[in-house]
């Protein structure tokens, strides 16, 4: 159907959808060379504040806890907001990744999620994570598998990798990088709305701005 529409002059076609329909790599594969990708991220704090207004400090505290998923603004109370974020994480994001990517070790995927969520902005890499899982959990998962799983989390727009620009040569592959949550509210929901270290949360929020 889309190919038929492409033949009509002076027509722009916008194809939208959540990650439950298409992950990032699916979009690139389906429409390679025939489209432009426009990524719509959760609200930054600036966008969030433009919607809620009021005292900026109070708005920031609210944003640092619940994040910038737009539907959060329509939830009536704290319990509803927390339940929404928990459900979104478990029923949409995790299920999509497991089903579409054929994840064989969901337990390892969720361990990686917990580790990244609890240490946003900290330096790490797949080898370090693999060693941590081996020492703490007795897991024999390879660094390559960890790298692939992290790639799936990025592909689902749960995390974004920040690399150093002063690393060259072979060390580029082994040097630790930082991973930031695409939405701090989803990060908080994953770890039960605890570990509210404001320095790391603020760093994550600034990165997303």
Segments the model singles out, each with a brief description of its role:
Residues 5-28, 153:
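Sensor-1/coupling segment of RecA-like P-loop NTPase cores
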Residues 78-209:
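Accessory nucleic acid-recognition modules appended to NTPase machines
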Residues 18-20, 24-123:
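Interdomain motor-coupling "hinge/lid" segment immediately C-terminal to the ATP-binding subdomain
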Residues 16, 40, 162-164:
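Conserved beta-strand termini and adjacent loop/short-helix elements that scaffold enzyme active sites
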Residues 1:
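Conserved P-loop NTPase "ATPase switch" module shared by AAA+ and STAND
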Residues 14, 36-38, 180:
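Hydrophobic/aromatic beta-strand patches that form the interior of the parallel beta-sheet core
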């Amino acid at each position: 159907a889309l190919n038929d529409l492409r033949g009509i002059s002076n027509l722009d076609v916008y194809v939208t959808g959540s990650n439950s329909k298409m992950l990032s790599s699916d979009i690139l594969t389906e429409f390679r060379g025939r489209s432009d990708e426009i990524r719509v991220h959760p609200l930054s704090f600036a966008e969030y504040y433009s919607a809620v207004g009021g005292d900026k400090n109070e708005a920031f505290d609210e944003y640092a806890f619940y994040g910038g998923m737009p539907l959060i603004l329509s939830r009536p109370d704290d319990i509803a907001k927390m339940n929404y974020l928990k459900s979104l994480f478990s029923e949409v994001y995790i299920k999509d990744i497991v089903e579409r990517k054929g994840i064989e070790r969901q337990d390892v995927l969720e361990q990686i999620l917990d580790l990244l969520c609890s240490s946003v902005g900290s330096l790490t890499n797949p080898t370090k994570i693999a060693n941590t899982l081996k020492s703490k959990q007795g897991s024999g998962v390879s660094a390559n598998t960890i790298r692939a799983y992290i790639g799936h989390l990025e592909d689902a727009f749960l995390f974004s990798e920040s690399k150093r620009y002063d690393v060259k040569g072979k060390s580029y592959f082994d040097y630790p990088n930082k991973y930031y949550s695409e939405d701090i509210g989803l990060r908080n929901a994953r770890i039960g709305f605890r570990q509210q270290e404001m320095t790391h949360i603020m760093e994550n929020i600034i990165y997303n701005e």
